[in-house]
């Protein structure tokens, strides 16, 4: 039975790339970012009824990044990427909490957060990473001390970064070239290390049990040791290709290939 539906209008994307931003859900709040070639906005709906709770116009063009909902100082915030500005909205009211200068064209990677920081990246026609301290973040942060560190090279175009136990992992563009940084300081542990059997990557890396998994478009998943040194533990190839990010549930890894859905676990 259909409970409700909501027409948000026609979305006009450049180059016929289509849509890519996933709605974000927290409690009864369903957040949708609608950045396109027309009038862009972010809207929050009641998940039970589809009723519009708030809407904010956005001076943005196309983006594909999924918003991130997080809590800071008891306040729930919606963090969004963007070419012109990075923004955070109050989840309850839609008020802009903070903003700062944006990233590059075509922002696709989704924000990740941890240890009091949120990380926003992009990598089309340029490179951009901003590590933003959430404590005390308010108003325009562009030239403030809340921008803890930045990076202007070797950032991802499609894959989102992985923040795992204090280490931020980044792929370069859509290539199997991996870097790892101290998340708090930006100090590099290693940079642009080649994943030889996964040269092309759209999927975001994932981490669990002291390992990092990178699924390549050519069918190979590279397994690396989580840590400050680059060490490949295994390279597992299936007769398929992967663009979707792996999903980790308990002790299983789910891979959605071009042809099949795989569940991988110890027997």
Regions inferred by a protein language model and the residue ranges of each:
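Noncatalytic, solvent-exposed loop/strand surfaces
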Residues: 1-267
């Amino acid at each position: 039975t259909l409970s409700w539906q909501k027409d948000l209008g026609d979305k006009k994307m450049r180059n016929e790339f289509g849509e890519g931003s996933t709605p974000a859900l927290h409690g009864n709040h369903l957040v949708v970012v609608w950045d396109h070639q027309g009038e862009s906005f972010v809207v929050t709906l009641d998940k039970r009824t589809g009723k519009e709770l708030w809407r904010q116009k956005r001076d943005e063009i196309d983006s594909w990044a999924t918003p991130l909902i997080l809590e800071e100082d008891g306040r729930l915030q919606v963090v969004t990427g963007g070419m012109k500005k990075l923004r955070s909205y109050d989840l309850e009211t839609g008020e802009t909490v903070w903003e700062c200068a944006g990233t590059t064209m075509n922002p696709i990677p989704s924000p990740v957060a941890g240890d009091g920081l949120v990380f926003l990246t992009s990598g089309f026609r340029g490179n951009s990473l901003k590590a933003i301290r959430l404590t005390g973040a308010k108003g325009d942060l562009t030239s403030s001390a809340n921008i803890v560190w930045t990076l202007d090279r070797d950032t991802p175009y499609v894959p989102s970064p992985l923040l795992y136990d204090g280490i931020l992992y980044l792929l370069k563009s859509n290539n199997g070239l991996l870097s790892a940084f101290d998340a708090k300081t930006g100090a590099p542990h290693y940079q642009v290390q080649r994943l030889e059997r996964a040269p092309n990557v759209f999927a975001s890396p994932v981490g669990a049990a002291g390992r990092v998994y990178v699924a390549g478009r050519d069918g190979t998943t590279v397994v690396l040791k989580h840590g400050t040194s680059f060490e490949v533990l295994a390279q597992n190839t299936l007769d398929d290709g992967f663009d979707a990010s792996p999903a980790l549930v308990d002790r299983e890894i789910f891979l959605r290939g071009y042809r099949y859905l795989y569940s991988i676990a110890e027997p």
